[in-house]
Regions:
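The feature captures the conserved acid-bearing segment of alpha/beta-hydrolase catalytic domains
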Residues: 182-205
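Alpha/beta-hydrolase active-site loop
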Residues: 105-127
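Active-site nucleophile loop of the alpha/beta-hydrolase fold
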Residues: 161-171
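An N-terminal hydrophobic leader/cap segment in hydrolases
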Residues: 1-42, 52
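Short beta-strand element of the alpha/beta-hydrolase
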Residues: 60-68
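The serine-hydrolase catalytic nucleophile loop
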Residues: 69-82
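Conserved alpha/beta-hydrolase
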Residues: 83-102
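Alpha/beta-hydrolase fold nucleophile elbow
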Residues: 127-140
Length: 205
């Protein structure tokens, strides 16, 4: 059985955290153009994650979006109009330490938090009667939490979308100059994207 917890511990190494995450704080109000609503999901006492919701209409498909490592949810004010033109509701979530969120990012926190963020996303839509199909999408680093959600909650999703994602931990750590951390691990797991995605049977792009 794959030890995903071991893989997450690897991504909490201080050198990896420093090279993998680039948190940037950004505070922004609700806006009308584009229509964007702030929403905060509580993870634990003192820690909440700031999200931005860009609505089209209640019966439209809904995308839970995990962004790349150098972005924040408010950055998507510039991209959201494209999704709106396509008839989509877009829900963008940050990570700890990013945007309007509390705390500091780590690899294990990003994956564990994804579960609470998914439940927060579904609760948000249910409370507002947004009944369209639900998808999860990840870009770059965000492919890891997106694949995690699709792996665990496929029955609640209509599909998975991966943009500029990555598969193996070996290739990712090699790109950021950290491959030496794998010298004593013959079967490194990392986030396990390559393992999890083989088990995902919902439509995937």
């Amino acid at each position: 059985m794959t030890d995903f917890e071991k893989g997450l511990r690897l991504y909490d190494h201080p050198d990896i955290v420093q090279r993998l995450f680039f948190p940037r704080r950004e505070f922004i109000e609700d806006t009308e153009n584009p229509t964007a609503l702030n929403y905060f999901i509580s993870l634990e006492p003192g820690i909440s994650i700031g999200c931005r919701f860009y609505p089209f209409r209640p019966d439209a498909p809904n995308i839970l979006f995990f962004h790349g490592n150098g972005e924040t949810a408010p950055d998507y004010d510039y991209v959201a109009p494209v999704y709106r033109k396509l008839g989509l509701n877009l829900f963008v979530t940050d990570y700890r330490g990013y945007g309007m969120s509390d705390g500091s990012p780590t690899g294990s926190a990003m994956i564990r938090d994804a579960h609470s963020l998914f439940h927060g996303f579904t609760d948000f839509l249910d409370a507002r009667q947004f009944k369209g199909k639900r998808y999860v999408m990840g870009r770059s680093l965000g492919s890891a939490p997106a694949i995690e959600i699709a792996y665990h909650y496929a029955q609640q999703l209509a599909g998975l979308i991966v943009e500029s994602g990555f598969a193996s931990v070996q290739n990712q750590l090699r790109r950021i100059g950290m491959a030496y951390l794998l010298e004593h691990d013959p079967e490194p797991v990392g986030f396990g994207n390559d393992i999890k995605i083989m088990e995902i049977k919902i439509p995937t792009l």
